[in-house]
Amino acid sequence: MRTQSLLLLGALLAVGSQLPAVFGRKKGEKSGGCPPDDGPCLLSVPDQCVEDSQCPLTRKCCYRACFRQCVPRVSVKLGSCPEDQLRCLSPMNHLCHKDSDCSGKKRCCHSACGRDCRDPARGTAPGCPGQANSDLGSVALHLSWGPTERVHDGRPGALPAGQHYLYQRWFQPSDNHWPADTSLQPIHPWFLLLGVKVHSLSSEEGLCITPVLCTTAIRASHPS
C-alpha cells in the first residue's frame, strides 16, 4: 500500500494533476506564526483543536508532535524566505528557531542543512501564501488536486518558494480528490516536498496563483 500510494502521489505531481487553491487569512485565524516542530511522531494523538478560534487568548492552533494543539504564537517578520538550491551533505544544524532570533529584517529560514538567519527574498508580493507573515502564520497554503484538474496552460501547479511539508494525511490510491495542508515547518514522518521553483502572481482577489513547472522529490513513510 505504501509503495502504491507513493507512486500515485509522485505521478500526480509529475504530470501536473495538482491544482493549488490558495487562500489568505481565514475567518477566525489569529495573527502570528506557529513555533517550529522538529520532533518525531511518537504517538497517534487526536487533534485538540481545528482552528485558532478554538484556542484561548493569543494561542494558535498549530501542529506539535504531529497533532494539532493550542500553543503560544510566535512573531513572524514580513517577506518570504529565499529559495535554497543547495543539497546538504552534513548533519542538520539549526542556527535559529524563530524570526526573533535574527537581527533586523532577517528571517529564520529553513535551508538545506537546517534553519539560519537570511534576508527575505526581494520582489515578493505582500500577503501571498508561503511568506508566513504575521497575517498568514506558518500554514503556507491549502491545495487540492483531482485527475482532471489542470492550470490554464496545462503545466503542473507549483507550491510557493521554500520547503513544504504535507500534514499527517495519508494518500490513498482510490482518492479522486485529496485536499492537503502544507507547512513551512517539518512534520515527521510524513511527505516532504523539495526543490520547488515558483514565481508567485497575485490575482485581483488577493489570491496567489503559481502556474509554473516545478521539480519535486518525495520522501514518505507510512504511519504506524
UniProtKB/Swiss-Prot annotation:
- Enumerate the UniProt keywords alphabetically: Disulfide bond, Protease inhibitor, Repeat, Secreted, Serine protease inhibitor, Signal
**InterPro entries per record:** Elafin-like_sf (IPR036645), WAP_dom (IPR008197), WAP_four-disulfide_core (IPR050514)
Enumerate the spans annotated as WAP domain.
27-73, 74-121
Molecular function terms from GO: serine-type endopeptidase inhibitor activity
Kindly state a single biological-process term from the GO annotations of this entry.
Answer: antibacterial humoral response
According to the UniProt record, one GO cellular component term is: extracellular space
Checking PROSITE patterns in the record gives: WAP
Q: What induces it?
A: By p53/TP53.
Question: Where located?
Answer: Secreted
Q: Please name one Pfam family that this protein belongs to.
A: WAP
- Where is it mostly found? secreted
* Keyword Phosphoprotein in record: no
User: Record's superkingdom?
Assistant: Eukaryota
SUPFAM superfamilies to which the protein is assigned, alphabetical = Elafin-like (SSF57256)
Tell me where the signal peptide lies.
Answer: 1-24
Cystine crosslinks: C34-C62, C41-C66, C49-C61, C55-C70, C81-C109, C88-C113, C96-C108, C102-C117
Function, as annotated, reads: Putative acid-stable proteinase inhibitor.
Record-given protein name: WAP four-disulfide core domain protein 5
